[in-house]
Regions:
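Short amphipathic alpha-helical interaction/hinge segments
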Residues: 8-13, 39, 71-75, 103-110
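Amphipathic alpha-helical segments used for helix-helix packing
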Residues: 36-58
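Short alpha-helical scaffolding segments that buttress acidic/His motifs in well-ordered protein cores
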Residues: 28-31, 43-47, 95, 99
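Hydrophobic/aromatic-rich alpha-helical bundle segments in the mid-to-C-terminal region
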Residues: 57, 61, 78-130
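Alpha-helical structural segments
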Residues: 1-22, 29-34, 62-73, 117-124
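The cytosolic transmitter module of two-component sensor histidine kinases
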Residues: 24-25, 88
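Secondary-structure edge/capping motif, primarily at the C-terminal ends of alpha-helices
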Residues: 19, 50, 106-110
């Protein structure tokens, strides 16, 4: 469990080693890619196991909370988002929720063409919302 959580965090930090990216489309695409890749699938298997195992649930929940906070923080940095502005925090969280949803949709079918259209739309929405 710890390995999967650490690998997801490492992959996230490695997205843009120089920090904030000027291209929000690239940031959105990279975040979505994290949720459509093998590390997300591995995490999902842990989630399913934890949903039925009372002893496992607290540990997986703790790890996911940590990875979730780090993902949010890194997304804010990469998007140059100012969370002191009302609605910005929720916008970033919505982006991450959308990315997770696309990851779930990708489990059974490859919807890369639709996913690219959604990524493009979200990048435009973020440009408007974040300035």
């Amino acid at each position: 469990m710890e390995y999967v959580a650490e690998e997801r965090s490492t992959a996230l930090r490695a997205l843009f080693p120089e920090g904030a990216a000027g291209d929000r489309h690239a940031v959105v695409a990279a975040l979505v890619d994290l949720y459509t890749g093998p590390l997300f699938r591995a995490a999902l298997h842990l989630w399913v196991a934890a949903s039925n195992e009372d002893q496992l649930r607290p540990r997986v929940t703790e790890l996911e909370s940590r990875v979730g906070r780090e993902t949010h923080r890194i997304a804010v940095d990469l998007l140059s988002a100012d969370e002191s502005v009302p609605g910005v925090r929720e916008t970033v969280q919505g982006l991450l929720d959308m990315a997770r949803g696309l990851g779930l949709a990708n489990l059974l079918t490859d919807d890369a063409a639709r996913r690219e259209r959604v990524v493009t739309q979200w990048a435009e929405l973020l440009d408007e919302a974040l300035g």
